[in-house]
């Protein structure tokens, strides 16, 4: 397996990171995950635009143009012969010796790019049968719109869900539902798609954006606004979405069944529209059972 370290492809076992790298010591960096279908990137530009936007919000300079970055990632995918999978890439602020919280202004740090590509099949069974979720207080920082390497709050929530045999943790600040530990959450109520507004309390998921777009194109009303735990529990349908899980229904929350406990009709419609978008961009799909 080859991975990318700056502009070099190296064997996985030969890849190293400096112990004084600010990403390693502070989580000072940003990242993205881009999906591949049939060896082709899906919503690549949207992901990379978000990467550069996140970097700009923390005054981090990515040392490659968007065109140079795409060329590097395409080489990474080709070298590893990825058909259906994910590319994980991150950029840290770089090496600072000695370690200091303050970003130096007397010399520029050189950002460090790393990336890896892996084959990850689609999970059609999960898309249909769904999964369960727990609810958990959202204790993360207040700039969740930045796709930062700082993920400890997400990790703790996700691990708590795992310990309870749940797929996800749905996060809330008081009564207000925000998102999940590793995905966005949406509900369907009286035929309306309802999802949290794209503000600083959530990451504006690329899959979320595609879902909103196809919903509007197909006449499904969309409401981008806060909703409560009560709204969540009384919803007709609940689903989570992300680059890796596409659109996955939630059948139970905190052990309580959502509606009839099955994927709802609008969730199914939205996933079909989503698959059509993938097919247009990347070709016909093969489902993993």
Curated annotation (Swiss-Prot):
Query: What's in the keyword line of the UniProt record?
Result: Aminotransferase, Pyridoxal phosphate, Transferase
One cellular component term from this protein's GO annotations in UniProt: cytosol
Binding of substrate, residues:
31, 99, 101
Query: Which region is the signal sequence?
Result: none
Query: Assembly and partners?
Result: Homodimer.
Entry's Gene Ontology BP terms: carboxylic acid metabolic process; D-amino acid biosynthetic process; D-amino acid catabolic process
**GO molecular function annotations of the record:** D-alanine-2-oxoglutarate aminotransferase activity; pyridoxal phosphate binding
Name it: D-alanine aminotransferase
Q: Which InterPro entries match?
A: Aminotrans_IV, Aminotransferase-like, BCAT-like_C, BCAT-like_N, Class-IV_PLP-Dep_Aminotrnsfr, D_amino_transT
Enzyme group, top EC level? Answer: transferase
What gene does this protein come from?
Answer: dat
EC number(s) reported in the record: 2.6.1.21
The residues that hold pyridoxal 5'-phosphate are: 50, 179
Entry keyword Transferase: yes
What's its job? Acts on the D-isomers of alanine, leucine, aspartate, glutamate, aminobutyrate, norvaline and asparagine. The enzyme transfers an amino group from a substrate D-amino acid to the pyridoxal phosphate cofactor to form pyridoxamine and an alpha-keto acid in the first half-reaction. The second half-reaction is the reverse of the first, transferring the amino group from the pyridoxamine to a second alpha-keto acid to form the product D-amino acid via a ping-pong mechanism. This is an important process in the formation of D-alanine and D-glutamate, which are essential bacterial cell wall components.
Asked if the keyword Metal-binding belongs to this entry, the reply reads no
Q: Which reaction does it catalyse?
A: D-alanine + 2-oxoglutarate = D-glutamate + pyruvate
Q: Which family does it belong to?
A: Belongs to the class-IV pyridoxal-phosphate-dependent aminotransferase family.
Needed cofactors, names only, are: pyridoxal 5'-phosphate
